[in-house]
Amino acid sequence: MMTYPMHVAGLVRDLPICKVTEDFYIGAFIMFGDAELTVACARDLLKLAEELDYDYLLTAEAKSIPLIHEMARQSGAEKYFIARKGPKVYMPDPISVEDRSITTLGVQQLFLGRDDADLIKGKKILIVDDVISTGGSLHAMETLVAKAGGTVAGRMAVLAEGDAKNRDDIKFLAPLPTFKADGRVRRAHNQTEQERRSNE
């Protein structure tokens, strides 16, 4: 399997390059089971968050759960929120929004219980994700926060994939390119001529 060496938070991980379409491949960044990476990324994201004024952290199920838990642990936060991919029997009167993700086929939904929504109401929420790519999941979380009556204080991720690195409304630790079928890095719209040559 082709891999890509990802340098982030002072560590290096070889990401498997996985097929999305015939000529569009992505590097699979998985934090599950990697305690060292999770701790390091949480530490560095909290450094980026120091200038932000927020009350709570929120992420979407599931890959970012270890990350947001570690961020809460390191910062001493007693509460954070997880937008779930399905309603649970213990969720009173849940609210929901649609979510489209590059790594998930079709349309899915994100849910918050009314109890969590009531805590978010009137509060400033920092949205956290492992990877921001098309921005579909990010937009869904923003909509969920607004639906609960909160405001988005900031948006951050470990990696910004593809053109997401050009967004000026997110904070991230490192850019992650996308790839062609042969493993070469795809050309970004804003690459310099020197960068293009290095990828050929």
Give the positions of each predicted feature.
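Short, glycine/charge-rich flexible loops or terminal/linker lids adjacent to PRPP-binding catalytic cores
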Residues: E78-I125, N190-E193, R197-S198
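PRPP-dependent phosphoribosyltransferase catalytic core
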Residues: T3-P5, H139-E200
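Conserved acidic residues
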Residues: D55, K123, A153
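Conserved G/P- and acidic residue-centered "switch" motifs that form tight phosphate/ATP-binding loops
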Residues: D130, G135
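Conserved SAM/SAH-binding loop-helix junction
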Residues: P66, G136, A140
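Residue-level preference for short coil/turn positions at secondary-structure junctions
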Residues: D53, G76, I120-G122, N166
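Conserved PRPP/pyrophosphate-binding segment of the phosphoribosyltransferase/PRPP-pathway fold
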Residues: V39-L105
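Active-site-facing substrate-recognition patch
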Residues: M1-Y54
